[in-house]
Amino acid sequence: MKVKGTRRNYQHLWRWGTLLLGMLMICSATEKLWVTVYYGVPVWKEATTTLFCASDARAYDTEVHNVWATHACVPTDPNPQEVVLGNVTENFNMWKNNMVEQMQEDIISLWDQSLKPCVKLTPLCVTLNCTDLGKATNTNSSNWKEEIKGEIKNCSFNITTSIRDKIQKENALFRNLDVVPIDNASTTTNYTNYRLIHCNRSVITQACPKVSFEPIPIHYCTPAGFAILKCNNKTFNGKGPCTNVSTVQCTHGIRPIVSTQLLLNGSLAEEEVVIRSDNFTNNAKTIIVQLNESVAINCTRPNNNTRKSIYIGPGRAFHTTGRIIGDIRKAHCNISRAQWNNTLEQIVKKLREQFGNNKTIVFNQSSGGDPEIVMHSFNCRGEFFYCNTTQLFNNTWRLNHTEGTKGNDTIILPCRIKQIINMWQEVGKAMYAPPIGGQISCSSNITGLLLTRDGGTNVTNDTEVFRPGGGDMRDNWRSELYKYKVIKIEPLGIAPTKAKRRVVQREKRAVGIVGAMFLGFLGAAGSTMGAVSLTLTVQARQLLSGIVQQQNNLLRAIEAQQHLLQLTVWGIKQLQARVLAVERYLRDQQLLGIWGCSGKLICTTAVPWNASWSNKSLEDIWDNMTWMQWEREIDNYTNTIYTLLEESQNQQEKNEQELLELDKWASLWNWFSITNWLWYIKIFIMIVGGLVGLRIVFAVLSIVNRVRQGYSPLSFQTRLPVPRGPDRPDGIEEEGGERDRDRSVRLVDGFLALIWEDLRSLCLFSYRRLRDLLLIAARTVEILGHRGWEALKYWWSLLQYWIQELKNSAVSWLNATAIAVTEGTDRVIEVAQRAYRAILHIHRRIRQGLERLLL
């Protein structure tokens, strides 16, 4: 009974098992994801590109030619746009910033270009007979006389005049720093032989008369498709992550001031003093100090000079000091001691935070080198000042007290003026700055310092010695560009979605007039991918218009330079920026076109998403990640995905071509269009004409053949009755039999009748042959259909048979298994019961055995 019950229940078990297996397979199947292209996503990468300049040059003197050539820059934007990027952290490194290198190259190029048309002073590399200019009357202190003794020399020399073969003697005043003695052999006279400095190793070029070195703020701007990230952290040290980031198109106005030791007229720190270095533990690295409060420095050259010109050749004039009116006094700079001491105190506080709170900070003078390094060098109204800063850097800051920092008086820095300047940007070039007439004074603000730290074995553990440094102008530019870096906008984004490009259809490709506004749309960089994808239209609408506007501004700046013989470095950069912006836009549009996504903001594709690229779920991607995070996730696979998109689009276009070829057969109604009917009639006329022509040819050949045989028929269509055979006489006796069935022969006369008869015969022949062919085809189809149907029925019955056999076999096997299991279970239960009974009867057997023994 148990076995029969198991057999009945197993039929239901089989059905339920099959149903559960199918449900398990359905539930285990994962939904397939597909690659989707998005245009206008806020994604960027670090880049190196050509920057161009913007400047408001109209606010400055137009009488002179500014060495910075800011007239060639585009006008500054009156309403600059700055977009704060929320929830964005970006790494900056001011020590590896290509913007600094570009500015260095630009300033070098501008200096070189401004000196190209100027006079070369090679004829002045002659022997100079010089004496000290000793006019020092009406001075109140003898110290002044000693200080200025030998500062200015009156030199005579032989020079070629405007007539080349004529040499005359001229006199000129030179600064002591600009001449070097040749020999001191003469002891009987009060003059010595000198020559101009740098004559032995450099080409000296005189600055053109109307060249101005007055620094004008220059804004560096990026082309369309690029942007500048700006770090707004108030205590940012120039290296590392920045959490307060914004994006701008141009930097702030940077004054290209060439100076050493002290940074002038730069930007100030917003809170405390900030010190920056590439590596504080490496004493070879320069320390850039940014002050939070500026220190005024006022410089003066009190002498009232006049300027005269000496002709040193045809069309070449050398400008020198004519005479000095009034007292000969040293140039000097004034700094408030109280302000300077307060500044040093804040710097010391930051240095101790960096190097140790128990350190003694010592400021000392420069350790030596070129005059540009030893002294604070800068340009003041066209004159190059070299000021001794020993009084500024000559104190010790201990933990309890400070030495040499007391007082509220004014620090007076003695300065010397050089007219022959060794060009800071390259070796082998020198510049002669013509003297400026009248008294000179200029006021500047000290906004930063360049320091170096002493190292080696002579430094004690509790003392750090700092000295003024400089000389590498990159540090000057770096002090202003530390918070910027250039990025390249990547508006093309790729992400997985559930949507697939389903239908292959014909589609007109419109010109893409949408894109990613290179500033505005980056404001959504901190939002999730899902939130950004809902506003792609707004984000992508202004790219082309932004490019066009920028192109117009650049073009106007270039047109303003057409009167020049050659473009400045700014003009070249503007041309490069114009080309680069268009190239960037065309590249993105080309990729969209290759992928079949032209004119689309969201473009589905037929490329399946590979889990090896990223195995994150859709919810994690679209709800928790920003586009920047997602771009870093799949950055290594971007090129692979691009290749697959291109291959998929090529296959789709091939399928589209095949589909279009099938479209001609899909629309049968086109067969009845008037165009097709005219084509049919033309073909019919050609066929009939060909047949008639063949008929005529064969008729002529037949006539020729019969004429050669000796006779000619009465008509082309004469048909003689065919005689009956001997078994069929023409008639029957007594006129009672069947009549003769031979038809009368049609005798046709005329050419048209002949054509009609031939055409009629041809049509009848064609009709009979086509009818026979259709009957054969119909019979063949009928036979094949019947046999095919029989074969299908046979295979269906065979399939049903094998399915039934498999089912019966499975049921039999399962039934046998169930029976075996059941029988085995019964045997096990029976054995267990017997063992249990035997155990229960042990005491009875023992009792019975004892009873037998007792009996």
Swiss-Prot record:
Span list, region V1: 130-154
Lipidation (S-palmitoyl cysteine): C763
Any GO BP annotation: virion attachment to host cell
Region (V3): 299-332
Record's comment on post-translational modification: Highly glycosylated by host. The high number of glycan on the protein is reffered to as 'glycan shield' because it contributes to hide protein sequence from adaptive immune system. Palmitoylation of the transmembrane protein and of Env polyprotein (prior to its proteolytic cleavage) is essential for their association with host cell membrane lipid rafts. Palmitoylation is therefore required for envelope trafficking to classical lipid rafts, but not for viral replication.
Region (V4): 387-415
Signal sequence coordinates: 1-31
Span list, region Fusion peptide: 510-531
InterPro entries named among the record's database cross-references: Gp120_core_sf, Gp160, GP41-like, HIV1_Gp120
A GO CC term assigned to this protein in UniProt: host cell plasma membrane
Stretches the record annotates as MPER: 661-682
Residues in coiled coil: 632-666
Keyword terms: AIDS, Apoptosis, Clathrin-mediated endocytosis of virus by host, Cleavage on pair of basic residues, Coiled coil, Disulfide bond, Fusion of virus membrane with host endosomal membrane, Fusion of virus membrane with host membrane, Glycoprotein, Host cell membrane, Host endosome, Host membrane, Host-virus interaction, Lipoprotein, Membrane, Palmitate, Signal, Transmembrane, Transmembrane helix, Viral attachment to host cell, Viral envelope protein, Viral immunoevasion, Viral penetration into host cytoplasm, Virion, Virus endocytosis by host, Virus entry into host cell
Pfam families registered for this protein in UniProt: GP120 (PF00516), GP41 (PF00517)
Motif YXXL motif, residue numbers: 711-714
Extracellular side: 32-683
Additional information: Inhibitors targeting HIV-1 viral envelope proteins are used as antiretroviral drugs. Attachment of virions to the cell surface via non-specific interactions and CD4 binding can be blocked by inhibitors that include cyanovirin-N, cyclotriazadisulfonamide analogs, PRO 2000, TNX 355 and PRO 542. In addition, BMS 806 can block CD4-induced conformational changes. Env interactions with the coreceptor molecules can be targeted by CCR5 antagonists including SCH-D, maraviroc (UK 427857) and aplaviroc (GW 873140), and the CXCR4 antagonist AMD 070.
Family in the record: Belongs to the HIV-1 env protein family.
Protein name, as recorded: Envelope glycoprotein gp160
Protein species of origin: Human immunodeficiency virus type 1 group M subtype B (isolate ARV2/SF2)
Lineage: Viruses, Riboviria, Pararnavirae, Artverviricota, Revtraviricetes
